[in-house]
Amino acid sequence: MLAASLRSPGTLTLEKRPIPVLGPRDALLAVEATTLCGTDLRIATGQKTNGVTPGVVLGHEIAARVWRIGDELTAGVDVPAPGTQVGLAPEIACGQCNACVSGRSNVCARMRLFGTGVDGGLADFILVPQEALACITPVAREIAPPLLALAEPLSCCLRATRRLPIGPDSRVLVLGTGPIGLIHCALAAFAGARVMACGRAARLEPARTMGAETTTTSQGDGLVANVQEWTGGVGADVVIIAVGDPGLVPVAIQCARIGGHVSFFAGFPAGATAQVDPNLVHYRELTLSGSANATLDDYASAVDMLSTGSIDLSQLVTHEFALSDVSSALDAVRTRAGLKIAVRPDGMVGR
């Protein structure tokens, strides 16, 4: 099979390797699409090395089909039957640490991830070991594989929004109009909220299409003024920081209303710091919260939302590349040529 593996930090190699050997309690999936994110690019270029196993096959946003199951597994009981279209949650949690037993398996102390510590989706096939069978999530009805691959980023956004008071007529400010910010716009609009998106001019039209009623490129005091005007001087009920810029933190806090919530969704550079006015947090009684990864329940909900058509993210996938041209796919991510870039096994592009 063809696979894109990390030979060493910054060296991504496209190679032919044997199809993984199926153990008695493993499952083998045929990959149908893997969408890329900034993390994949940082790993491929050597900027991210923590938690990355040398030689690992990259790709953690995965849509696939069950190909074979081990002799000791029962189809439809232990794992979906061969031929079933599935999403694959990337988080393999231990189930035993304090985080796992308290319901936060998304921040498991011994987390392993498909695409960083375990071979991921930039290959023709992916082996799912026994301890990760619960990550295999069948669809309610079949959908385009690149769309199904978006269940992973959707599940992470869903994890955050489930912890925020977003409902009908809530005012939600989304900072950042990359794919993650756009998904947050769609989720907030789905919940009935009114959404303002702030980001680069080129991404404002997609933000409007995905649920933002108003958009802005303003920064700093200009953004605060925009939010005040939009909310009648009250401020946003919820502010979601969807891009890893520490400079947005003080502005986000200024934009929140009394009793408002600020979600630190984006990951920030290692060692990053932000200056916060503690009196704003104190006197406005603000709630600041973080969110990372997703639980299996979040992922299952995301697959269900996509496969039932409850939420439409189809416009996010703007480019498809064959696996044999994965270097061009990563270049498209680097140059921001589109929104989400999908990589598919050779012969499947456009199908």
Q: Can you say where each PLM-predicted feature lies in the sequence?
A:
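Glycine-rich beta-strand-centered segment in the early N-terminal region that forms part
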Residues: 20-34, 48-98, 140
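C-terminal hydrophobic helical "lid"/dimerization subdomain
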Residues: 1-3, 250-254, 296-351
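Short, well-ordered loop/turn sites that connect or cap secondary structure elements
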Residues: 77-80, 166, 256
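N-terminal glycine-rich cofactor-binding segment
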Residues: 3-21, 38-69, 87, 102-117
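Mid-domain Rossmann-like dinucleotide-binding core that forms the NAD(H)/NADP(H) cofactor-binding site
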Residues: 141-220
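NAD(P)H dinucleotide-binding glycine-rich loop of Rossmann-like/cofactor-binding domains
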Residues: 94-175
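Short amphipathic alpha-helix with an adjacent loop that forms part of the alpha/beta core around
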Residues: 222-232
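Glycine-rich phosphate-binding loop and adjacent beta-alpha segment
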Residues: 245-308, 345-351
